[in-house]
Amino acid sequence: MIWKLSERKDWNSLEQQFGWVRDMNQVPQHTVHHAEGSVAVHTRMVFEALLRQPAYLMLPEQEREILWAAALLHDVEKRSTSVDEGNGQVTSKNHAKRGETTVRTLLYRDIPAPFNIREHIASLVRHHGLPIWLMEREDPLKRACEASLRLDTSLLKQLTVADICGRISTDKEVLLEATEFFEMFCREQQCWGKAREFANGTARFHYFHTPRSYIDYVPHDDFKCGVTLLVGLPGM
């Protein structure tokens, strides 16, 4: 059975069904980076951009539903994080992080989704900006591999491309180029469309919890120990 956030996907129906969709109409955005207007206008444009992607149309139905839901929800918490700094500058720091929590709650309480689907959508919302800024941050390899353990990086790129194309701004070409670098990097690091593999659980734990660690390092397994067992019989 295919899970769907909603059978009715036209915008008017979505507004009637969900208060958080209606809220998007009241949330302004940065007039330079999002000259199209409110979050509602942007999200509708993201839908249109997503439907223009051949890769999206070729996905299995369940993956299309996951990506569609992530597109609808990717900016849901701009409503709680947006701050008007004046002169058309609107910031929304941590909207993706807060959105992840909202999505997880929503898909648990209001629109129940299977665990793996819920977590995939929540992770896509959390990381929807990752392909844009990955190469500018400290330790991009660790960030990419960590994301690959939570989501499909090829779906993440599709979401980010739709997010970029679904806006009016002057830097779209630069942002789209960043998503291409993201794909190249993930392919090179063996985490494109799949989770990055490690030799074992200990190696994975060591890599993510040790600063400046080598990704293919396999720690010596020193968890074994000797046991001396004393057994006594009653009355002996």
Question: Model-found features: residue ranges?
Answer:
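Acidic/His-rich, divalent-metal-binding segments that scaffold phosphate/diphosphate chemistry
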Residues: 1-85
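Exposed alpha-helical structural elements
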Residues: 10-16, 20-23, 45, 116, ...
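Short, well-structured alpha-helical interface segments that form or flank functional binding sites
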Residues: 41, 120, 225-228
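Conserved hydrophobic/aromatic pocket- or pore-lining residues that grip, position, or stack substrates
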Residues: 46, 99, 233
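Divalent metal-dependent catalytic cores for phosphoryl transfer on phosphate-bearing substrates
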Residues: 51-175
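Interdomain "pre-motor" coupling segment immediately N-terminal to P-loop NTPase/helicase cores
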Residues: 157-199
